[in-house]
Amino acid sequence: VGSEMCIRDSHNMGFDAIDYLIEKYNIPQAGVKFNAMYGKGVIGGEKVILMKPLSFMNLSGGPVQEMANYFKVDPETELVVIYDDIDLDPGQIRIRKQGSAGGHNGIKDIIRRLGTEKFLRIKVGVGAKPKGWDLADHVLSRFADSDRRLVDEAIENAGDAVEKILSQGPDAAMNESNSKKP
């Protein structure tokens, strides 16, 4: 998940990872459907649909649910959501097979709309908000130069984790990615 209005901001990690995959695997945009841009291609020998909800971040569940229903995607076995996580250090990624929203309103809406917490997610660390900052100001801010390199690497690692999930399975991707330190 992300927002076209937050390009290169910490709240846009999902979109940045999708852009990385689009470029790396030459996946063309197929169009706009259900308030989401999407493209179809092949990654790790598997057919994929990459999508970017065009809704507000906190309403990402609608486009995800509608796209999953239309393309007959089983959220519990065929969906991967990539998003920012303030509980992880900048540059760190963490893959989980299920779990709560952890305070992320976009994920909360996806869980609500899908009716399950059981879907694969790749969290990209953006770091905790600085003391005295509003959370919204933090996630909508640009990265410090010192963190930008780490975050760019994490975006690539998140994209590469998608390929590993598709070619070797989620456990292999989790074993490799969850143990990496930025």
Residue spans for each PLM region:
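Conserved N-terminal catalytic core of the sugar/cofactor nucleotidyltransferase
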Residues: E23-T77, V81-I82
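Short glycine-rich anion-binding loops that position phosphate/pyrophosphate groups of nucleotides
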Residues: S3, S55-F56, D85-L88, D171
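Short, small-residue-biased leader/transition segments that mark boundaries at the very start
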Residues: V1-I7
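Conserved beta-loop-beta/alpha segment of the NTase-like Rossmann-fold superfamily
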Residues: V64-R112
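Phosphate-binding/catalytic loops
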Residues: G91-P182
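Short catalytic helix/loop segments, enriched in acidic residues and glycine
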Residues: H11-Q29
